[in-house]
Structures are given as C-alpha cells and as structure tokens.
C-alpha cells in the first residue's frame, strides 16, 4: 500500500527537489502540493518535466485546516513561516520540516540521519538539519566522538552554490552579481550557528563556544564544500580510521583518502568526508561535501521519512550523482 505524501512549499528549490524524489519513490504517492507562489497551477505548469502521473495535480494554497488524508508531510517553508501552521497539522501525520523553525525545538527530533538514525524511527516530528550543518557535522562527528579534536577550537569555512539562497533570491543573487564572484555572508551571526554549536556539544560532551563559521556563496548551482580546522594531535590515518568505523555500514556517507569535490555529490543524498592532519602542528583539517538540495535538504528529508515509516533508508535515494 502506498504512503500518502504532501509537500508544502513546493514552489521553492527545496520543495521542488522533494517533489522530484517523492515522484520516483517506490512507496510514496504525492497527493497534495501547496505553494504560495504557484497556487492554482497544475504541477506540470510549475515543473514542465514532472512525471506524467503527477502532471495534473493542482497546487493549492497552504492551509493546514484543509489537508487531505496524509501519512507524511514535507514542509519547505522560509524561516518563521512554519512554526504556528505546522502545530495545527493532525498528530497522526508524520512531518519532516526542511525549514529552520523546529531545529532543537521542544517536541521535535533533530534529524541528522547518518549520526542519530536510531532516534528518528519512532518519532512523528523531525526537524531536518540545515545544509551547512549537514556538510560540517558529518565529517566532524567521528572526530568529536573519538575525542580527536578540541570542540572549542573549530573553524568552519564553507562554500555553497547559489541555490542555497532559495528560489526567492533577491539583490546579490542574480546572474550578473553572482557570476565570477565570491560572496561571504552571515559573518558571526549565521542562522545555522546555534544548530552547529549545539550538535558539536551534544556529540563531544564539551563546549563549542569558540566556534567560528563563515559561509560563502560561489557561482555554481548546487553543492557545499566545508573545510574545517581544529586543534588536535591525531594523524590523518587516525582521522580516516575513526570516520570509517563511525560510518561503517552507512548507505550515504563515503570516506575518501583524497579531498572531495562538490560534483561528486550533485543530485544525490551522498556525503563525502576526508581528512588531513599534522600532529606536530596540533592541526586537523576535515572536509565535507554534500549537495545542498540533497543531503542538505530534500534528500535527507526523504531519508528521515523512510526511517519514520519503517522503510529502507535508501528507498527513493539510490540514484547515482549527476556527472559531469
């Protein structure tokens, strides 16, 4: 029997990617789509390449009081837009919030699926991690768990594609402004900082108050590369070994000897991690790559929904990355 799925915020990049993944999922059936900017349109008008079986599904105006019978709801709304509305969704509907309103909120489980999968299976309210936390915490988790680095010395330098700014865009995100340009933003106050700090402290049992995180927009469509520096006396071999043990049996995290590239993960739910360390300099470098719309958003959301529904976590996510 199919699992009835709805997507709120389908007009945006995250919601659109969720639609693409749900459309190809062996157990999910998309029966409801809502989007403020596209209400009244057929799905094929908004996404001309949508599968024929979904072409005539009409996008509705988001109203939690008028939901059809659903098993799972994906919410991909701007920060501040989902907290009150999702509270009115019936308790028996499983929700994965791709937006930022419920990360570490009471009553919600933080869905970093490759680190804490056992906590997700029995829950009905999952807060998907942000794209930068997904890219940074995945390589950091093994080092923190094995006490190979000091959690209060972490510096994260991250680069993301323009789709990370969302479909709404705005000044600074147009082609003429972003092409051949590198744009730092959110210095010292990025919205993902508290989420990263709290997760580092949770994994390590120590303080992350010294965290430095600087994101940059780069002129590519999708992908995140996080280059992370921390103090520690570990060797490169010890870091790689810790990651291989931590992610043994993982369907999505790949530990690689050479530095990963954003193209490796494009269009997929994969995460690539690698390390370089110099114990004489008390320095560890960790590298993490994800697709910001995949593992950083809709891919991880589907992975979380699979776990919530008792399905194989790889269901609907087994496609290879797009190359080149």
From Swiss-Prot:
Keywords: Amino-acid biosynthesis, Arginine biosynthesis, Cytoplasm, NADP, Oxidoreductase. Belongs to the NAGSA dehydrogenase family. Type 1 subfamily. The gene is argC. GO terms for biological process: L-arginine biosynthetic process. SUPFAM superfamilies: Glyceraldehyde-3-phosphate dehydrogenase-like, C-terminal domain, NAD(P)-binding Rossmann-fold domains. InterPro entries: AGPR_type-1, NAD(P)-bd_dom_sf, NAGSA_dehydrogenase, Semialdehyde_DH_NAD-bd. GO terms for molecular function: N-acetyl-gamma-glutamyl-phosphate reductase activity; NAD binding; NADP+ binding. This is N-acetyl-gamma-glutamyl-phosphate reductase. It is an enzyme of class 1 (oxidoreductase). Pathway: Amino-acid biosynthesis; L-arginine biosynthesis; N(2)-acetyl-L-ornithine from L-glutamate: step 3/4. One of its GO terms (cellular component) is cytoplasm. HAMAP family: ArgC_type1. It comes from the Bacteria. The keyword Cytoplasm applies. The active site is at residue 131. Pfam families: Semialdhyde_dh (PF01118), Semialdhyde_dhC_1 (PF22698). Its EC number is 1.2.1.38. It is found in: Cytoplasm. Catalyzes the NADPH-dependent reduction of N-acetyl-5-glutamyl phosphate to yield N-acetyl-L-glutamate 5-semialdehyde. It catalyses: N-acetyl-L-glutamate 5-semialdehyde + phosphate + NADP(+) = N-acetyl-L-glutamyl 5-phosphate + NADPH + H(+).
């Amino acid at each position: 029997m199919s699992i009835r799925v709805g997507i709120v915020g389908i007009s945006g990049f995250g919601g659109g990617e969720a639609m693409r993944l749900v459309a190809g999922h062996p157990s999910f059936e998309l029966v409801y789509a809502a989007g403020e900017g596209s209400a009244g349109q057929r799905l094929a008008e908004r996404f001309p390449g949508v599968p024929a079986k979904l072409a005539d599904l009409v996008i509705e105006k988001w109203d939690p009081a008028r939901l059809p019978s659903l098993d799972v709801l994906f919410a991909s709304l701007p920060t501040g837009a989902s907290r009150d509305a999702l509270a009115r969704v019936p308790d028996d509907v499983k929700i994965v919030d791709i937006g930022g309103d419920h990360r570490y909120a009471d009553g919600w489980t933080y869905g970093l699926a490759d680190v804490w999968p056992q906590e997700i299976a029995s829950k009905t309210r999952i807060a998907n991690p942000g794209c930068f936390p997904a890219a940074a915490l995945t390589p950091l988790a093994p080092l923190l768990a094995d006490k190979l680095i000091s959690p209060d010395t972490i510096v994260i330098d991250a680069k993301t594609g323009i789709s990370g700014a969302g479909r709404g865009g705005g000044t600074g995100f147009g082609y003429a402004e972003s092409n051949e340009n590198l744009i730092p933003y959110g210095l010292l106050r990025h919205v993902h900082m508290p989420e990263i700090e709290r997760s580092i402290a949770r994994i390590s049992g120590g303080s992350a108050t010294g965290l430095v995180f600087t994101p940059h927009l780069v002129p590519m469509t999708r992908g995140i590369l996080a280059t992370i520096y921390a103090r520690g006396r570990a060797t490169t071999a010890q870091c790689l070994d810790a990651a291989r043990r931590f992610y043994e049996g993982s369907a999505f995290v790949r530990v690689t000897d050479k530095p990963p590239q954003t193209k490796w993960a494009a269009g997929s739910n994969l995460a690539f991690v690698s390390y370089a360390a110099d114990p004489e300099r008390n320095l560890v470098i960790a590298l993490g790559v994800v697709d910001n719309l995949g593992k950083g958003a809709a891919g991880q959301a589907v992975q979380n929904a699979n776990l919530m529904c008792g399905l194989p976590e790889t269901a609907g996510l087994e496609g290879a990355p797009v190359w080149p």
